């Protein structure tokens, strides 16, 4: 099977001249410039380190006014741990002052400020993405964006109903040496760059908004289709983004998937995993990994996302514009989407 894959991959690349990667859907792009979206963003990471030069009570009052409950969340989860009942101001101050002067923490913050002296680029990307999100999902409410230092533990996540928190330290670039010391796998690092900040921020909002995740009641194929729906939505929110960024693959991995789509589909069918509800299979084909077991090294992990995306694209093409993006996400079961997609790579 591996030899067959390698032969087909090389042969198809020779014929295609590697143009598969640049082949994308062409569709009208709506004008969202007039949508009334106001993006408020704050640098919790920088404000936190202002404690080094300020009186504690005044600083804390300012932090609570600006960040609300996220201040206590950060304190409990990154600085001090669960606080005892009663007045803990003295404990807070001692722990926070130790935290902001800690050599390791300061090194991470220095790296953040070196890569992100400001977040204007990310805010431009997020503002445009939120406009598209609002256009396609009118009930979408724009969150306040908080950037913070997660000590290499958290990327992007909604916080409550009105805030989105982004750990900038998870997007410092694959050359960041600290990623070695904290054990970040090499195969993940191409996604830990500034270009991915807005993409993963919007994905986290999508997951929260649609309560998206792998449904334990679904078979593997249905889980792939649902993942494909999410990636397809991201392609509308980021219309200029290449498939590699949307899928989280490298360019070479994306080229492999494009040129070997038929063989990938055959491989999954031959494995007889698509119509079974097996959590290990879902993890194997939809989870993060350096590659997919049984396939060539060029194949990415999480290869089910690519197949799911292609099924959804086929479905939307078959509907001829009769199904809106909103309806795609909310009305139709994954099984129906696959059956009506007439997917035949």
Regions found by a protein language model. Give the residues of each.
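Sec-exported extracytoplasmic/periplasmic mature domains
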Residues: 49, 134-138, 234-242, 269-273, ...
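Residue-level recognition of alpha-helix termini/interfacial anchor residues
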Residues: 63-77, 136, 252, 256-261, ...
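Acidic/His/Gly-enriched intrinsically disordered linker/tail segments
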Residues: 229-292
């Amino acid at each position: 099977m591996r030899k067959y894959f390698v032969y087909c991959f090389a042969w198809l690349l020779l014929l295609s001249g590697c143009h598969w990667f640049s082949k994308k859907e062409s569709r009208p792009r709506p004008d969202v410039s007039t949508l009334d979206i106001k993006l408020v963003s704050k640098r919790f990471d920088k404000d936190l380190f202002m404690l080094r030069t300020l009186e504690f009570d005044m600083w804390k009052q300012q932090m609570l006014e600006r960040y609300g409950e996220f201040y206590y969340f950060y304190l409990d989860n990154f600085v001090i741990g669960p606080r005892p009942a009663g007045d803990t101001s003295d404990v807070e101050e001692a722990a926070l002052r130790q935290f902001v002067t800690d050599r390791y923490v300061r090194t991470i913050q220095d790296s953040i400020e070196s890569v992100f002296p400001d977040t204007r680029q990310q805010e431009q990307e997020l503002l445009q993405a939120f406009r598209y999100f609002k256009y396609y999902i009118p009930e979408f409410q724009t969150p306040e964006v908080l950037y913070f230092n997660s000590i290499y533990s958290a990327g992007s996540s909604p916080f409550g109903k009105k805030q989105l928190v982004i750990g900038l330290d998870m997007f410092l670039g694959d050359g960041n040496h600290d990623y070695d010391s904290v054990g970040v796998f090499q195969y993940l690092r191409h996604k830990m760059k500034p270009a991915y900040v807005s993409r993963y921020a919007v994905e986290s909002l999508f997951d929260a908004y649609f309560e998206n995740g792998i449904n334990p009641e679904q078979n593997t194929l249905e889980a792939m289709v649902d993942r494909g729906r999410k990636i397809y939505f991201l392609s509308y929110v980021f219309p200029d983004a290449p498939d590699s960024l949307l899928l989280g693959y490298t360019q070479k991995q994306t080229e492999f998937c494009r040129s070997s789509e038929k063989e990938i589909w055959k491989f999954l069918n031959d494995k007889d995993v698509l119509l079974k509800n097996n959590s290990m299979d879902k993890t194997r084909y939809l989870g993060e990994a350096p590659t997919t077991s049984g396939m060539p090294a060029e194949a990415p992990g999480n290869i089910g996302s690519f197949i799911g995306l292609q099924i959804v694209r086929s479905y939307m093409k078959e509907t001829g514009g009769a199904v809106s993006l909103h309806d795609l996400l909310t009305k139709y079961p994954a099984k129906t989407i696959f059956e009506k997609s007439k997917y035949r790579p």
